[in-house]
Swiss-Prot record:
Keyword Iron in record: yes
Protein name per the record: Cytochrome b
GO cellular component labels: mitochondrial inner membrane; respiratory chain complex III
CDD domains cross-referenced by the UniProt entry: cytochrome_b_C, Cytochrome_b_N
Self-association state and partner proteins as the record states: The cytochrome bc1 complex contains 11 subunits: 3 respiratory subunits (MT-CYB, CYC1 and UQCRFS1), 2 core proteins (UQCRC1 and UQCRC2) and 6 low-molecular weight proteins (UQCRH/QCR6, UQCRB/QCR7, UQCRQ/QCR8, UQCR10/QCR9, UQCR11/QCR10 and a cleavage product of UQCRFS1). This cytochrome bc1 complex then forms a dimer.
GO molecular function, one term: ubiquinol-cytochrome-c reductase activity
Keyword Ribonucleoprotein: no
Positions with a binding annotation for heme b b566: H97, H196
PROSITE patterns registered for this protein in UniProt: CYTB_CTER (PS51003), CYTB_NTER (PS51002)
Amino acid sequence: MTNIRKTHPLLKIVNHSLIDLPAPSNISAWWNFGSLLGLCLLIQILTGLFLAMHYTSDTATAFSSVTHICRDVNYGWLIRYLHANGASMFFICLYMHVGRGIYYGSYTYLETWNIGIILLFAVMATAFMGYVLPWGQMSFWGATVITNLLSAIPYIGTTLVEWIWGGFSVDKATLTRFFAFHFILPFIIAALVMIHLLFLHETGSNNPSGIPSDSDKIPFHPYYTIKDLLGFLSLILLLLLLVLFSPDLLGDPDNYTPANPLNTPPHIKPEWYFLFAYAILRSIPNKLGGVLALVMSILILAIIPLLHMSKQRSMMFRPVSQALFWVLVADLLTLTWIGGQPVEHPFITIGQVASVLYFSIILILMPLASLIENKILKW
């Protein structure tokens, strides 16, 4: 009799995705981040569900309901900090995953890559709206500043902002709708993840060499199930270290002050994972220009496949491109640092230089390096 996992309509899908899936024999730890993102999403949905049981999305009670969760609910503090720091782990894995895609040329799987970009936008939107929910000072002012950016859109801007706010400022209506969206989006993300995997399994995984590996495949189980499990344990260990020893390390102390529309915090800044984009936004002294640069800082990922000039897929054997890639990483770290600094000399100039460099590397220097490397191949 044939094994049930190969015949049952539902188990067959699981089998072809997680058990008998042919996988390249040489994929490194950089290929662990996809499954880690799945784990992060699961952690966020579960902790978020339990938080939603005790949270109230009303301006009068939102802040105190979060306090109530931390003080009075059994292990509420643990659930809350797992959720808050889980978001940080989510973004660490996301950026590593995208970086891996750029380094090893995984963006040549166009459908998978484009769904991935949509996923990135969806996760960023979810994280932003989640940050508003505790209704602290940084929640309120962060929401005010970021939603206000839409007013830079010509003609419809102001109307659009008031429509999103549900009034003439960030208030009750805004908080309630942000909670609704924050609750529904992770499930939409989960559906998009399924599509992401569907497209990936059409082509199979890429590998570090960038060379087709059809002649050398191994079954996903047990080789990569055990490898993913090791990744899971590492991620959970790191998350628990963060949650149990320094839960507020990555947060802003201003968010422990209840939201007050009459008192602006001296430095309005988003969570650390948005600082690089925030720095790019602030580098341009024009509102609409800044907003366009902000959107393009992520949307530029969609252009990367079009700029692939190399005869090789991966950067594994391309030292010039490798050097540029790591300069790009350093540049993003610089932007992250600048995003958290006040708008004054010398930070303004550093931010502007780093922003120009960010776009230059991706749009100009990397394609040029690829062409140079193609020439070197002929020597």
